[in-house]
C-alpha cells in the first residue's frame, strides 16, 4: 500500500492529537504533534522568566534552543535542549505561552523547517494549526477537525482533572477562546480551513466515530475501501 502524508488541522482542544495517534497506530504511520514543538518553546520562555511579548528576548532564547522530535515505540518524545519534556509541556501554564510564541515569524520558520524535513519520507500524520495550508500544502489528505469552544473546554477540563491538575472550566473556556482568536488573527499562517480540506465537526461524535470517518477518507484517497 502506498504511503501518503495526512494533515490534520483545527483549533485547540478539537481532538487532533488523539485522532492522529489512533490513526497512526492503525495505519503504521508516524504521528507528529507540531503543537508540542511550540509548547516546548513556550516552556523555555516561561522557565527563562521572559514575558510572552518580549520578542527580542525570545529570539535570543530561540538562537540557543535545540528542539528534536524522537519516535520511540510509536510515541512522540519532545526533546528540549536534550531533555525529555513530553509531559512538562502539557502543563496548563504553558498553553498561552505556546500560543503567543507561535505568532513570532522566526519561531514558526525554525519549527516549520523541522516539520517539513520530518515529512519528506511520507507515511506521516501531522497535526497542528497550519499543516494543510502552510507546512504541508501538498499533503494528499487534509482534515480540519473542529468542535464548539464549550465542548473543547469540557474535554480539556476532564483531561487535566484526570492528570491531577486543579483547573476551572470557565477559565479554560476563556483561554480556548483567546487561543482561537490568536490563531485566526496572527499575521503568518493563521488558522483557516484549506481549500481542499474536509471539515469534521466532532462536537457530537465519539472518538471512534471520528476515527472511522477519517479512515474512510484515507482509503478513498488511496483507492481502497474500508
Curated annotation (Swiss-Prot):
Give the UniProt subcellular location, in the record's own words: Cytoplasm
Give the matching InterPro entries: Cytidylate_kin, Cytidylate_kinase_dom, P-loop_NTPase
Enzymatic class: transferase
In short, the EC number is: 2.7.4.25
Keywords attached to this Swiss-Prot or TrEMBL record, sorted alphabetically, are: ATP-binding, Cytoplasm, Kinase, Nucleotide-binding, Transferase
Please give the CDD domains that the UniProt record associates with this protein: CMPK (cd02020)
Q: Specify which residues bind ATP according to the UniProt entry for this protein.
A: 10-18
Q: Which reaction does it catalyse?
A: CMP + ATP = CDP + ADP; dCMP + ATP = dCDP + ADP
Keyword field contains Transferase: yes
Q: Which GO terms describe its biological process?
A: nucleobase-containing small molecule interconversion; pyrimidine nucleotide metabolic process
A GO term for molecular function: ATP binding
Question: What Gene Ontology terms describe where this protein resides (cellular component)?
Answer: cytosol
What is stated as this protein's family in its record? Belongs to the cytidylate kinase family. Type 1 subfamily.
Please name the PANTHER family in this protein's record: CYTIDYLATE KINASE (PTHR21299:SF2), CYTIDYLATE KINASE/PANTOATE-BETA-ALANINE LIGASE (PTHR21299)
Q: What is this protein called?
A: Cytidylate kinase
Organism expressing this protein natively: Caldicellulosiruptor saccharolyticus (strain ATCC 43494 / DSM 8903 / Tp8T 6331)
